[in-house]
A protein has these predicted regions:
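An N-terminal assembly and electron-transfer interface module characteristic of large anaerobic redox
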Residues: 1-269
Length: 269
């Protein structure tokens, strides 16, 4: 028989210990919707409130620098937005994939396997998720040394932290084998951005600098990503469908240029 507890008080000003995933300061006599509304109103009126979500601080680590001139660097593109060749040959799941695929930049066509955003914009133009056209143009111009002729893709939506870290380790090991100098990661929705962030962190632990492009920059920063560029929208981080084709390309190019510039900056963490 469980003993009834009247209140479990918060300790926002003091230290507390966690036992597993149990949060020790929630008043469970109020329903979750009531507690959520109380927090929302407190935030709106500028009053103090205590989040029920405990986030571990990002671990302190050194931030890798680009080891060569950008004009000689080999850049790899990665996305957590579920871009796959037409027909989805690897049967990439649309949620919580837990695996990744390696695909050519020269496929005849692409589709998206991802339940975290409206994929119609990317299926209309995949460059809105993965800026292949802008990167290829910058390669031709000599702004970068080489764009890898393939990209890595996974589906980050609904992927837990633990699974994201495990996936990140697998991808990082693959990246090392391909001898690249830097990585650009493009991300979609919230949990997908979180997954992409952990992938980037694991790659950086191997000494390769990463820039993450996402509309949800706060998530990436809170996870501990060193270099983050704000994308336009979770449905098209590197696109702007309202613009004409040339205008959208120039918009995407500016995002890519900003990301590449960040690779040349020295970050302190």
């Amino acid at each position: 028989m469980l003993r009834q507890i009247d209140y479990i008080y918060s300790q926002p000003e003091g230290s507390y210990t966690k036992e597993g995933k149990i949060i020790p300061f929630i008043n469970y006599q109020k329903s979750a919707p009531e507690r959520c509304l109380d927090m929302l109103l407190a935030k709106y009126y500028g009053e103090s409130y205590q989040s029920e979500v405990l986030m571990d601080l990002p671990e302190k680590r050194s931030v890798p620098e680009l080891r060569c001139d950008l004009r000689k660097a080999t850049i790899l593109l990665i996305t957590d937005g579920g871009l796959v060749p037409k027909g989805n040959p690897d049967r990439m799941p649309s949620t919580n994939a837990g695996k990744f695929g390696t695909y050519s930049l020269e496929e005849e066509g692409y589709e998206v396997s991802h339940q975290g955003y409206d994929t119609s914009y990317v299926e209309e133009d995949y460059n809105r998720l993965l800026p292949i056209d802008a990167m290829q143009e910058m390669e031709r111009e000599g702004k970068i040394g080489k764009l890898c002729p393939f990209f890595l893709s996974t589906v980050g939506v609904m992927t837990s932290v633990e699974r994201s870290i495990h996936l990140g380790k697998q991808i990082a090991a693959d990246v090392i084998k391909n001898k690249v100098d830097a990585v650009l990661i493009t991300s979609a929705c919230g949990t997908s951005t979180r997954c992409g962030a952990y992938i980037g962190i694991e790659i950086e632990k191997r000494g390769i600098p990463v820039v993450q492009i996402t509309n949800l920059t706060r998530i990436a920063v809170d996870m501990g990503v060193s270099r983050v560029v704000k994308g336009n929208n979770i449905c098209y981080p590197c696109g702007e469908p309202k613009r004409a084709e040339e205008g959208e390309y120039l918009y995407r190019r500016r995002i890519v240029e900003k990301a590449l510039h960040m690779l040349e900056e020295i970050c302190e963490k």
